[in-house]
């Protein structure tokens, strides 16, 4: 994800830190194993230091977290330039299948997602989403407002 922002707030450097208090980007994903609905979704939140907060579950509370080995496989990296910053990470299929069971993903398959920009720090507090969220207070943990993505060849 690329964020057009100069001098992002980036306090946290360790995994599982509350990076949403910094200037952060977030990606949420939800897959359906073999066409059956699963309420479980994944969230990946990162700041411009590459500090990653990631979890999965069916609701905002009682999230499950990834192992140290899984965090290494995500290989979250951040880059900062004059007027923007970017975060890259990868999500190995075997980690998705550990959560959802066999997915047998192929070109043309779909999944649900949303992308966010956030900071909960009062001086720079802001919230934005790719797919609109129709709630009275900002919250990103609402799969009913996720968009649909289609898998294509890279």
Where are these predicted regions, by residue range?
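Structural preference for beta-rich elements and adjacent junctions enriched in aromatics
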Residues: 1-154
């Amino acid at each position: 994800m690329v964020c057009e922002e100069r001098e992002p707030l980036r306090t946290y450097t360790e995994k599982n830190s509350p990076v949403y208090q910094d200037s952060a980007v977030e990606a949420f994903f939800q897959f359906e194993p073999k066409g059956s609905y699963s309420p479980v979704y994944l969230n990946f939140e990162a700041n411009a230091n590459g500090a990653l907060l990631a979890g999965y579950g069916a609701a905002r509370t009682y999230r499950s977290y990834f192992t140290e080995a899984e965090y290494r496989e995500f290989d979250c990296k951040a880059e900062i330039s004059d007027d923007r910053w970017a975060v890259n990470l990868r999500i190995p299929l075997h980690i998705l299948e550990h959560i959802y069971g066999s997915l047998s993903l192929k070109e043309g398959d779909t999944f649900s997602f949303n992308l966010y920009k956030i900071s909960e720090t009062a001086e720079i507090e802001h919230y934005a989403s790719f797919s609109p969220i129709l709630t009275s207070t900002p919250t990103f943990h609402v799969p009913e407002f996720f968009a649909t993505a289609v898998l294509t060849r890279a």
